[in-house]
């Protein structure tokens, strides 16, 4: 509908409106790591009605980063991918500099590992990092992690250009 017909906006509104306006194919899109009270039941109903996959943080914690990464890769396939990374995906213990800190997020390691496992080799056409609020973090650990996240995305683009399409895990399984 038109902007005047839309309900009061919340954090998920731009994504929903992009689907309503035909800018995003919900069947090839996925949202991961949501937690807290920022989304309404209507938002989840809308997502389910339109085939938009979403994985709540609690489900990610239970299934693990690798399984979550596999679902992301399966969902987007070889299609062009625009990645929006919201820093409040990360637990405020590791990234307190955000306007909406909610406990129960992910560690710095889990965050970087998800980025590497899920996005290596994808047809990424754009990336943005949102919700970093330096004034809420005098320790600057949020900015340190945010800069590392941007570094990882740039490295993934370079790897893709070099023909590297799989994340080379160097540890023991």
Language model: regions and residue ranges:
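Active-site environment of divalent metal-dependent phosphoester hydrolases
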Residues: 1, 37-39, 134-136
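A general structural motif
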Residues: 10-16, 33-39, 61-67, 107
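A structural signal for isolated positions on well-ordered beta-strands in alpha/beta enzyme cores
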Residues: 28-30, 128
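Short, glycine/polar-rich helix-capping loops at beta-to-alpha or helix-loop-helix junctions
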Residues: 37-49
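Catalytic cores of soluble, metal-dependent hydrolases
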Residues: 46-173
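Short, contiguous, pocket-lining structural segments
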Residues: 6-10, 35, 82, 142
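Short aromatic-enriched loop/helix-cap "lid" or pocket-rim segments at secondary-structure transitions
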Residues: 5, 43, 95
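Active-site histidine-anchored catalytic micro-motif
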Residues: 1-28, 121
């Amino acid at each position: 509908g038109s902007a005047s017909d839309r309900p009061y906006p919340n954090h998920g509104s731009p994504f929903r409106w992009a689907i309503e306006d035909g800018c995003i194919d919900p069947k090839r899109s996925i949202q991961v790591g949501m937690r807290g009270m920022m989304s309404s039941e209507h938002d989840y109903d809308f997502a389910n009605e339109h085939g938009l996959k979403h994985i709540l943080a609690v489900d990610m914690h239970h299934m693990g980063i690798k399984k979550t990464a596999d679902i992301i890769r399966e969902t987007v396939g070889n299609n062009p991918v625009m990645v929006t990374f919201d820093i409040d995906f990360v637990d405020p213990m590791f990234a307190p500099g955000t306007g909406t800190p909610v406990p129960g997020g992910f560690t710095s390691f889990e965050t970087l590992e998800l980025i590497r496992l899920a996005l290596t080799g994808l047809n990424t056409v754009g990336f943005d990092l949102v919700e970093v609020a330096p004034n809420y973090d005098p320790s600057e650990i949020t900015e340190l992690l945010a800069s590392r996240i941007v570094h990882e995305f740039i490295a993934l683009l370079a790897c893709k250009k070099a023909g590297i399409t799989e994340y080379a895990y160097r540890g023991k399984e």
